[in-house]
UniProtKB/Swiss-Prot annotation:
GO MF annotation, one: metal ion binding
Enzyme nomenclature, EC number: 1.14.99.60
Pathway: Cofactor biosynthesis; ubiquinone biosynthesis
Entry protein name: 3-demethoxyubiquinol 3-hydroxylase
UniProt source species: Nitrosospira multiformis (strain ATCC 25196 / NCIMB 11849 / C 71)
Length: 208
């Protein structure tokens, strides 16, 4: 069971994720590219898609924190912590791009975080192989979702496309790492439920 220190650290992480700008150690992908001259419709579409991606990173932070809270193996905890650090960079990249596009973040971010944290904590309680399997499947689905966004983003919006492309590469790496550390293949019904939940989140975050 998680101790009080872990709970306090988790609460602090939640506040920082939701209330303070995320920081990145790596350069933001696409920084060197010129800003495209997008029309209002294209700009709105890019901002909405990047908002969805930002929500995805909010959820990823919460999932990893929940999983790490209940994970039983120190090595698994370290794997989750490393993935969370890279997701923090994704959070910073998407937030910066939303601001550049004069967009806004989702109004439901606290809800997304709370729900994802609970799911992650439950996954951790199932044992490390299922915990890592859940991580791997989550990253596979996120990678596929990012691929869909690459097909929807305006072709001229090279800055957003560069960010999403690098995020997709990172997510694939997280999935591979989780499997290498012993992640189990999830049953198909679980995968389908995850896809349905993801669909609700992405459709809602596009607008709200």
């Amino acid at each position: 069971m998680p101790n009080l220190d872990k709970l306090i650290i988790g609460f602090d992480h939640a506040l920082r994720t939701l209330l303070t700008p995320a920081q990145t150690l790596r350069p933001v992908p696409g920084t060197q590219l010129p800003e495209a001259e997008l029309n209002d419709l294209e700009k709105s579409e890019s901002a909405a898609l990047m908002r969805v991606n930002h929500v995805g990173e909010i959820c990823a932070q919460a999932l990893y924190q929940g999983q790490a809270l209940t994970a039983r193996n120190a090595e698994v905890q370290q794997t989750l912590a490393q993935a969370a650090r890279e997701e923090t960079e994704h959070l910073a990249w998407t937030e910066r791009r939303i601001n550049e596009l004069s967009g806004r973040k989702s109004l439901l971010n606290p809800l997304w975080y709370g729900g994802s944290f609970a799911i992650g904590a439950f996954a951790g309680l199932l044992g490390d192989k299922w915990n890592l399997g859940f991580l791997a499947e989550t990253e596979r689905q996120v990678s596929a979702h990012l691929g869909g966004h690459l097909s929807r983003l305006p072709h001229a919006d090279e800055k957003s496309r560069a960010i999403v492309t690098q995020m997709q590469i990172d997510e694939a790496g997280h999935a591979t790492t989780a499997v290498a550390y012993g992640g189990a293949e999830l049953p198909m019904p679980v995968k389908l439920v995850m896809r349905m939940a993801s669909s609700v989140m992405t459709r809602t975050a596009y607008w709200v």
